Amino acid sequence: MTQVRETVSFKAGDVILYPGVPGPRDRAYRVLEGLVRLEAVDEEGNALTLRLVRPGGFFGEEALFGQERIYFAEAATDVRLEPLPENPDPELLKDLAQHLSQGLAEAYRRIERLATQRLKNRMAAALLELSETPLAHEEEGKVVLKATHDELAAAVGCVRETVTKVIGELAREGYIRSG
């Protein structure tokens, strides 16, 4: 007999989890479809994208260990999620541990990129990364990415106005088209 999994869905832009706020949705999730953005926001409202969670990935795992959350989890696209049980089985825990290990390696790479690379290089890397997510699609042989300048600023650790300037430079140099 096949076990039926509980799933929940959110529309693009919906906040799934809030920092430090326990509630009925304060659970760990596996992404089945779509893309979830994890963002930290400072007192001035500046956001930093900590991680993009793709299908098969997990987020909210601190709920399994009673830890406070420091980020918002937002549906970057329409998403379908599987809430994890409070007491996951060993196979699920193994998948979660592997995901956490990969997430830690990704975090190290992002920290290294933020600390050592010029903004234009960080922007190019972010655009390439986003081009491989559900935020992008192919149209007439070209990758079309749907992302705001605010979202790009959060991805590379700068303000929107700077993103606008760098996007303009990349467009003038012929690397991208913006519009």
Which ranges hold each PLM region?
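Short amphipathic alpha-helical elements of helix-turn-helix/winged-helix folds
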Residues: 126-130
